Amino acid sequence: MNILMIAAENDALAGAKVGGIADVVRDIAPALAQRSHQVQVLLPGYQSLSEQSGSQRHDRFEVTFWGRVETVELYSVPGRNPVDGVQQWVVEHPLFAAAGKGRIYCDDPPDRPFATDASKFALFCVAAAEAAKRGLFGQLDVLHLHDWHASVVALLRAYHADYVVLQSIHTVFSIHNLALQGIRPFDGDISAVHAWFPGLDIEYKRVSDPRYSDCLNLMRTGINLSDKVHAVSPTYVAEITQPSCPEQGFFGGEGLDPDLLAAQQQGRLIGILNGAEYDSAVEPKLDSELERLLLAAESEVINWMSKETHCYSGHSIALGRIQQWLRNLDQKSGDKQMLLTSVGRLTDQKVLLLRQTMLNGKSALDNLLLQLAGRGRLILLGSGDPLLEQFLLEVAGRHANF
């Protein structure tokens, strides 16, 4: 099959990663290529990816957006580790650098959530749809849309007269973060559906937000308008077809569970277990490997601190802890403590259970670290909710193994 993946991130390109979606897009493309499929991956260029060494402009074409004609450019980019059967593409337009050159996401104020990003990715999606219609990627068999950023392709495919031709191509929609749903009004704002595509005749009941009926929900759009919906595991499918209950630390369908349950009953929702690929099974050399990791971490934290006008307490605590662990390695040979690591956004989805107060009055994370004392260490790399950052900083100040 000839598969076109459409996404906001892709770690196959330097500078195109913020979160886990980039890892999935990077790894799934060569995995499919190994099964004799042709895979093409398309991203916004953010006015920087097209400048990478070896990139070439392949086409320049026009799309209609905000009621006017916009010109976009399509570039091929070799990527960091080119793979046979995988072609990397980026599409460029000044709007894709709305947050600054090379920045993938914008931080909009609370009264206009997703506004800049939604407009940016809507333009990206109409460019992707136009390029696919023009045959710039060859005869496509599958459009693989990643998260809400790519779901406007499904909207155009369903309702826009210029792009209903894409209905002959199968669509798959992958859910990466169900909590971020890309909600924007239908009207009354420059970042609204009918501002992007004036006169678009939409079946509102299939794409409107379940809480705000005057708004488009781009996550729901991808779920309801795609032929197949993919989630990261069979267990996760069982979770997201149930209502969320954040008070108990359970994050299910985030308001979209009725749509997800319907998709499951229709045979459209599938859970495929995410995996991690390792080059080979190597017997770990604990002392030398841990020392090398800690030295690299020490160097990186110092590099971060050098760019700060005022010292961030999280970096100070981390540097002190890393140096303490290095001293302990020097003093004691054969350190057999296990090392736990976590990298991710600090959101309630990931951290809420760790904040829960146990019977002894301590948080779950405090209790875990107490149980690990002398037996294991935890390194957590992440940023996000300031309240969660502060909670983790306070815990780090209490435990020598965090």
Regions found by a protein language model. Give the residues of each.
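Catalytic cores of nucleotide-sugar-dependent glycosyltransferases that transfer UDP/GDP/TDP-activated
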Residues: 1-402
